[in-house]
């Protein structure tokens, strides 16, 4: 997946996950941030809703945050430069903690709307596909004060690996512009320690805030008598750095960036199981098809992980793949190998290898050590074959 791609523009006519369920007589509803580009996936939804911000972009609520946002946005509007990805609209603070009710922020309103839709389905008894796209814990880390108060700042520490990996190439560096765009953040260099602790605190608060909203929706499923016939998948669209390797935000080939949470609840299967099997986002589509008893479209590249719900320890994928920028990574049960290819020569211009058995935090790049030459050749062949197959994939 390329950042900020569009389904309608890049793969027009493709049968998306919600469209497939819609074609099979499910009522498909999108609430909140489901597609990155609102309005994308035309024909997939019978309803497509996002809450309007009540104050400014980013839904700031404190008077100070609103003032800072408006002043910076006015500066940007007067900027004669080109308004592109390198000159995005100025943003307000990276975090705030006003004493407001949960519903004041967008995620509270998204949860409320989801409950309303579930109440409708209790009455109609129609099969439904409800996508609830909560925004947190994306930046800015804005959450009601009570969620900040759940954590004592004195207990929050910087990560033990608050440094760039030893022997890693410059291509692996992350400038975390997404955070630098916010008010008060340095345009270059590391965060002051006090600011770094506040950012971590804000992330924790937002996780607890969105956890409460998810709980409201799940409680409604139970109360309305829908839980015993509803499959629930909770997943995030990416991981997040909280100072590991000196990084913040995401968009890195180091594993903290792409590693996302995934929890599945199927009423007729045992709960409480965990697996170390490797799965990918593309596996969710065929998994839901299998669990719902639908045939899977032929264009899918993923593999249903439904069997793991019964036997989480069975042999599974030997490797999965992800990319960030021009970096391509293969992840196995023991190693992560990344290459950046020089387009002129077709050869790697930089590479990384991490042995997760002894270095799960990816602190030491061992790609140039001679004892790993044979392993790298094998991983490289698998990675190149994957990229070739992916880029030449034909969608019927």
Residue ranges and their predicted role:
Residues 1-352, 356, 360-396:
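Formylglycine-dependent sulfatase
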